[in-house]
């Protein structure tokens, strides 16, 4: 009796809806874990080299003293977190950090400042930083708080590639985290960024006490932007003593992986970035996140004021996984603007 040969069919990425109601996003979260990861990896392979990871470096160019009350942030002036307020860094110090980042393989350099919104005199200094970093062949990104009329255009003219402004969480949970700036303020800034022709970097933070439904609500807000963000940072809350969210029950690591997978499925062409909280994850969870569709990490020993895995540890992990870093500063697949 002869046995029949076993045939395997190559996975086919499912058709991606053009709009995602919260209930549909929640249905993805509720899939059996293996089914969700398989679907996310299939979508990922349709759009990216699954072994490639982008390295981005984040530098705090102005630390502490922020007047906002974000419950997760050690840079808020009203919280006693041990962070000392500092003025904006000198240009040469920023450029030295950018050179080091490029030498270690980073292709994107992000500059963050703890402002509610930048004053024009400070924005001029950032514009100069952007021009000089851009001249090194690095992609440039900035996160400076809310932007007023005309400020996004100034950053665009200086050569800024990306502007980061996170939604943080779902609208329904937002008031549990922040009271000094409303959700519409964030939407307005993102509209100014997009209107100026700057690519959008926008994501959120999980593990702040929100429910799965509220995590689905955050993803729905992101993926229903038109177009959705080119970069989507997924942060795992880093609990800092002195902040209101210190002591919050941590999110289950597999729930974090699910969040990455759902972001990948709903925003297939975006760079999904593992951001804050990687140091607490360990290698196995990070590896699962890469399988789930994450393809960018913040690289370096520190993110603004919180710790990050050492650069050597990141290189060793990528080698273990047989992954390589993105080698060019331009990636057309990150263009999610409808043709």
Curated annotation (Swiss-Prot):
Any Gene Ontology biological process: biotin biosynthetic process
Residues passing through the membrane, by range: none
Biological pathway: Cofactor biosynthesis; biotin biosynthesis; biotin from 7,8-diaminononanoate: step 2/2
InterPro entries: Aldolase_TIM (IPR013785), BATS_dom (IPR010722), Biotin_synth/BioAB (IPR002684), Biotin_synthase (IPR024177), Elp3/MiaA/NifB-like_rSAM (IPR006638), rSAM (IPR007197)
CDD domains xrefs: Radical_SAM (cd01335)
Signal peptide start and end residues: none
Enzyme class, UniProt record, top EC level: transferase
Assigned keywords, A-Z: 2Fe-2S, 4Fe-4S, Biotin biosynthesis, Iron, Iron-sulfur, Metal-binding, S-adenosyl-L-methionine, Transferase
SUPFAM superfamilies in UniProt: Radical SAM enzymes
Catalysed reactions, semicolon-separated: (4R,5S)-dethiobiotin + (sulfur carrier)-SH + 2 reduced [2Fe-2S]-[ferredoxin] + 2 S-adenosyl-L-methionine = (sulfur carrier)-H + biotin + 2 5'-deoxyadenosine + 2 L-methionine + 2 oxidized [2Fe-2S]-[ferredoxin]
Cofactor stoichiometry and binding remark: Binds 1 [4Fe-4S] cluster. The cluster is coordinated with 3 cysteines and an exchangeable S-adenosyl-L-methionine.
Pfam families linked to this entry: BATS (PF06968), Radical_SAM (PF04055)
Domain named Radical SAM core: residues: 51-278
Cofactor(s) required for function per UniProt: [4Fe-4S] cluster; [2Fe-2S] cluster
GO terms for MF: 2 iron, 2 sulfur cluster binding; 4 iron, 4 sulfur cluster binding; biotin synthase activity; iron ion binding
Binding site for [4Fe-4S] cluster: 66, 70, 73
Subunit organization: Homodimer.
Family: Belongs to the radical SAM superfamily. Biotin synthase family.
PANTHER family, per the entry: BIOTIN SYNTHASE, BIOTIN SYNTHASE, MITOCHONDRIAL
Name listed for the protein in its UniProt record: Biotin synthase
Organism per entry: Janthinobacterium sp. (strain Marseille)
Name of encoding gene: bioB
